[in-house]
């Protein structure tokens, strides 16, 4: 039989539910009916029943132990919370008193200022003075507290403002040196206040560190005790041997008048071991007396059980727990069968509903898909029509653009020919002008000579010159008609060519327009053909899809038929299984009626119970022996604890007597300023203040997410471990 062990020392969270720490009272396989076994003389059933009863008793003991442990945890948490609540109430009362004192002190200060100023100054016409000195409250979290302070602040501000206005008006002009000195005085006063605040904070931290130092010393002492407890068994055996040797040596040394114990410095240890041995002996006497009393009671119970065993009737068998348990199991089986039948019917109805829903859902899905495909096809047709319209417009625009480009090119060629003819004319004109210029100097020379020396020339020379001039004149007259004729011919040819080029350009423009129209008609025909081909493809695709849908529907129909046949087979199998279950239930009822008449099985159960009692007795003896050993060890540890506590008190008094102010300051500096018991090991990133990890976790768990020193908000991510 499993023995309930003591709770382990592994740390576990405080918010553990009872269901998480309980073991299931039954296995997961208990839902199904148990498999049938043939009972041979009733032995197997009795063994199973006894094992079940043992497990149930063990589970009840385990649950009771778990409930008791959880109750102790709740008690400890309750004490801790009550202690914290008392501390919070004390701090709240202190802060309330502090605020009241500040309020009345401010009112008294303003009254004293009024008396001083009214006695020293006369009533003067006040001038408006800038009230830049009025301070504002930098507190964002509490609107009600802010309104409260504003209500208190208004009368104080009015009084102080009136006093400052009087002082400023009576003061007159202020020199810059005086203003500078006043600013220095203000800065010095502010520094003084900051230093005073720092001193107060350091004093508070010093006090917290001293408390943390005390708690740390206690923890060290506890750790030393635990270390002593964790000594091995071999060390304890060696200590017992040393104790036995020391007792023998002590007796011999006392007879001889020597004090070897004092010389070796082990007298105190031997005394403690002697006290431990005395305590163990006393405890053993008490245990022996308790064991004798238990033996007497057990003998009386054994005699009574023997008497009951000899005279057992059938009614007694019927009243036994085993018979009741077997009857309860039989009733549970019948209930399970009925429940399974009801659940089976419900499952069938649910399956039929789900099938109907599936068919309706498939039909709706197919309808939606068909509607969606038709909509998409209509949209595609509209888009195709729009595309053809856009393509035709594009082709028309391209044709117009080509015609315009061709006309522009033809105009450019005609203008180029005209320019060439004009250039030829200009060349000819320049040629003729050059000839005229060539001929003019001869005439000028011939004419200039007679003008210069006309009186000197003779008649023959004059006749020669005149004849020459007449010849030149006749030559020129002969050249001019030819020139005119050539010029006219060139002009006619040029005009004709220009007209031919213009006619050709017009013809080319007409041909390009006709070509663009023919291309447009060709492209339109191609587009119509593409549209028809696309429509044919879509119709073929729709035809193939419809054929696929028809084939799918046929496959679904065949699947439904196969499923219906399988379901009918399952229904037949379930009916047959139901019949078999009913027959089995009847057999079980007959077996249960027969079980009431079987006394032999009860005898075997009694033998099993006797064996179980013997095993329990052996287990109980072992537990008692262990308990006796543990109690003896506890007595030894109590003696050691008394000794260690006395030594602890001595060392503590020595430490406190030898401690200096610097040590106290360091102790207060290291201890947490909130709990005064733990060391500072966590720093807040936002403000830089240092506290212990437990205080920070408690504040986060209680949603008090503000620094205790500066009241600045922080989060779990702002907490960082600090190493001193």
UniProtKB/Swiss-Prot annotation:
Record's catalysed reaction(s): S-ubiquitinyl-[E2 ubiquitin-conjugating enzyme]-L-cysteine + [acceptor protein]-L-lysine = [E2 ubiquitin-conjugating enzyme]-L-cysteine + N(6)-ubiquitinyl-[acceptor protein]-L-lysine
Could you tell me where the Polar residues compositional bias lies? 241-262
For this protein, the record's SUPFAM superfamilies field holds: RING/U-box (SSF57850)
Note the CDD domains from the entry.
RING-HC_Bre1-like (cd16499)
Please list the GO terms describing molecular function. Answer: ubiquitin protein ligase activity; zinc ion binding
**Xref: PROSITE patterns:** ZF_RING_1 (PS00518), ZF_RING_2 (PS50089)
- The record places its RING-type zinc fingers at 672-711
Q: Where in the cell is it found?
A: Nucleus
This entry carries the following GO cellular component terms, namely: HULC complex; nucleus
Q: Which pathway is recorded for this entry?
A: Protein modification; protein ubiquitination
Keyword terms of this UniProt record? Chromatin regulator, Coiled coil, Metal-binding, Nucleus, Transferase, Ubl conjugation pathway, Zinc, Zinc-finger
- Coiled-coil parts of chain: 68-100, 177-656
Give EC number(s), comma-separated.
2.3.2.27
Top-level taxon in the UniProt lineage:
Eukaryota
Q: Which PANTHER family match?
A: E3 UBIQUITIN-PROTEIN LIGASE BRE1, RING FINGER PROTEIN-RELATED
Could you say which protein family the record assigns here?
Belongs to the BRE1 family.
Q: Per its database record, what is this protein's job?
A: E3 ubiquitin-protein ligase that mediates monoubiquitination of histone H2B to form H2BK123ub1. H2BK123ub1 gives a specific tag for epigenetic transcriptional activation and is also a prerequisite for H3K4me and H3K79me formation.
- By what name is this protein known? E3 ubiquitin-protein ligase bre1
Its source organism is Neurospora crassa (strain ATCC 24698 / 74-OR23-1A / CBS 708.71 / DSM 1257 / FGSC 987)
Q: Which gene encodes it?
A: upl-1
